[in-house]
């Protein structure tokens, strides 16, 4: 399973670890992914999403129904 937020689309970024001597070694910055079940009243069922903490705040703001419309418009099955 890929490390991509289903709401925001955030994915791992690539950067460097920097030592005290300024040596650079490659590293990945991973998104803060959580798996969360949301109750969708209009469908009378739970929907399981893999999303970041920011994605959860977006759902709090817009509502689960509006976010599901956006996700389905991109062609993802939910």
Curated annotation (Swiss-Prot):
Q: Which key words tag this protein in UniProt? A: Ribonucleoprotein, Ribosomal protein
The answer to whether keyword Protease applies is no
Which Pfam families does this one have?
Ribosomal_L28
Source superkingdom = Bacteria
**What GO terms fall under cellular component here?**
cytosolic large ribosomal subunit
Q: Which GO terms describe its molecular function?
A: structural constituent of ribosome
GO terms for biological process? Answer: translation
Q: Where is this region: Disordered?
A: 1-25
SUPFAM superfamilies for this protein? L28p-like
Gene3D superfamilies named among the record's database cross-references: Ribosomal protein L28/L24
Checking NCBIfam families in the record gives:
L28
Q: Which family does it belong to?
A: Belongs to the bacterial ribosomal protein bL28 family.
Q: What is this protein called?
A: Large ribosomal subunit protein bL28
């Amino acid at each position: 399973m890929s490390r991509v937020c289903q709401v925001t689309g955030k994915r791992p970024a690539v950067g460097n670890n920097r030592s005290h001597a300024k040596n650079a070694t490659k590293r990945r910055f991973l998104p803060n992914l959580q798996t969360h079940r949301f109750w969708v009243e209009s469908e009378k069922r739970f929907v399981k999403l893999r999303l970041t903490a920011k994605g959860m705040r977006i759902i709090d703001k817009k509502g689960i129904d509006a976010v599901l419309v956006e996700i389905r418009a991109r062609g993802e099955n939910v």
